[in-house]
Amino acid sequence: MKDIIIVGAGHLGLDVYALIKEINAVKPTWNIKGFLNDFPVDLDQYCIYEKVIGTIQDWIPGKDEHFALAVGSPLGKEKVVNLLKSRGVVFETLISPRAVVAKSAKIGEGSIIISTSSIGTCAKIGKFVVVGNTIVSFNSSVGDFTNTASYVNIYRNVIVGKRVQIWTHSVILNNVDDDAIVGAGSVVVAKVKAGTKVFGNPAKRMPF
């Protein structure tokens, strides 16, 4: 068993915790040492008995420690990655044993593929991406530091940029540029420009 520390103790941290337990149930792989978080969190309320063992800002990695990134904000996790990698942290790519991943698909460093996700033929998942119970269809791509919430469907040949947040039950039929936000339940039929927020069916631009 290898020691692993979960970076972030919010809702995504709980999902990553459950994912590691799911992996261990199939093949014992990880010993969860605890969480890193920059503010106090009571994990007992979630029936999680591992503790917050330090802060992200102050943690110095020890020998043979592995890390799972569970920071929810796309921009925030890029900053965390840059900070911790400068100290020598190595992030693990974690894939649920219940996910369906095509042999020709590519998944980048530090990405998290949760439960019943499906990654299609020739699909490309960048670095530090969260794929949450999402369908990523064939020949589509998802850029670095992007998050998809549960029950998102990314259509074939679609390109999703970097640091994008796509919320639950959205359908992505056209490209989404960097730093955009797609609101819950949206159907994207027209290209989403960089740095914009869209919502609705069909998805339309909304003020921040």
What is the predicted function of each stretch?
Residues 2-20:
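Glycine-rich adenosine-cofactor-binding loop
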Residues 3-4, 31-33, 64-67:
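Short active-site oxyanion
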Residues 6-7, 36, 70, 114, ...:
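Short hydrophobic segments within beta-strands
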Residues 12, 41, 204:
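Conserved Rossmann-like nucleotide-cofactor binding loop
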Residues 20-24, 84:
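Active-site catalytic pocket residues across diverse enzymes, especially alpha/beta-hydrolases
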Residues 40-100:
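Phosphate-bearing ligand-interacting subdomains
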Residues 93-206:
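Structural signal for interior beta-strand "rungs" in well-ordered beta-sheet cores
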